[in-house]
Amino acid sequence: MQAKAVARTVRIAPRKARLVIDLIRGKKVGEAFAILRHTPKAASPIIEKVLKSAVANAEHNYDMDINNLVVSQAYVNEGPTLKRFRPRARGQASAINKRTSHITIVVSEKKEG
């Protein structure tokens, strides 16, 4: 059985979020929380919140045991990009892309044995 949580249109670049999400993929949930708490990246608290939601979904919706949960899938997709302009010299302007992310975490119960 699998439980899933998704955070859509989060204001962090997918490239930066992937650095953190790669650290927790395949880990036990308790270990993943410990890694996220000690990772000094802006994406860490956001991903921790999504992981907490996935664990709550597993416990509440599917009656899974929290102690046996493993992060089976964790990925970041690109969300819509906010396009902004930065004024430059001599009346010019440069485009600034403020990227957003869709963060998905799937947890499943580890098989005993």
Swiss-Prot record:
Source organism of the structure: Geobacillus thermodenitrificans (strain NG80-2)
GO cellular component, one term: cytosolic large ribosomal subunit
Quaternary data: Part of the 50S ribosomal subunit.
HAMAP family in the record: Ribosomal_uL22_B
Annotated GO biological process: translation
GO molecular function, one term: rRNA binding
Gene3D superfamilies recorded: Ribosomal protein L22/L17 (3.90.470.10)
Name this polypeptide is given: Large ribosomal subunit protein uL22
Transmembrane domains' residue ranges: none
Family, similarity comment: Belongs to the universal ribosomal protein uL22 family.
Taxonomic superkingdom: Bacteria
Cross-referenced SUPFAM superfamilies: Ribosomal protein L22
Residue runs in coiled coils: none
Keywords: Ribonucleoprotein, Ribosomal protein, RNA-binding, rRNA-binding
